[in-house]
Amino acid sequence: EIASLPYSLPLLMHAPQGDGHPGLLLPGFMGSEGSLIALEVFLRNRGYAVQTWGLGRNVGFRPGHASALEQKIRYMHHESGRKVSLVGWSLGGVFALYGAHQASECVRNVVTLGSPVTVDAEGNAVPSLLKALYRLVAHPMGTAAHSMQPRTKTLRDRKQLPMPMSCLYSLSDGVVPPQE
C-alpha cells in the first residue's frame, strides 16, 4: 500500500479540505502510533485536528485501555467543543466502535479501515487468522471466552450507533469477511 502512495498523491491532493474538527486515530494490531504517520500527516494537511490514541503499540485490549480510550474521546470533545471523528485501522477500528458506543455523545462519526466488525459469541463470523491472533494476544480459548464481558457485549449486541459509520476494506485482505 505504501508503495502506491506516490501514484496516489495527485488524487489525494484533490481530497476536500476538512473543517478543523478533531479526529482520533487508532492503530491496527501490533501497530504503533508511528504506523499512522502518513494518515496523520495527510489529515492534518487537509485541515483536521488529529491525534493518535496515546496508548502505544496496539497489542489488544489491556487492563485500563477501555477507560483510557473513553477518557481520551471525552477529553478531545471537551477541549475542542466539537464532536470527534474516530478512525481505526484493523483492530483499531474495533476499538473505535467500542469508543463510539461508550461516548456516543462525543463522537461525530466512525471510519474503520480493514476492520473485522462482525463478531458473534462463538466467533463464527471471524476469519481463522484473526481467531488465531486473538488467541495469541487475548485468551487461549478464543473470542468466545470474552463474550460475556461488558466490552464484548457492547460490540456483540450491535446497538445502532447514533452517528454515521463508514467501513472501508478490500475483498482480498483476509481480515474482513466478504459478507460484511
Regions found by a protein language model. Give the residues of each.
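Serine-dependent carboxylesterase/thioesterase catalytic core
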Residues: 21-34, 38, 44-159, 168, ...
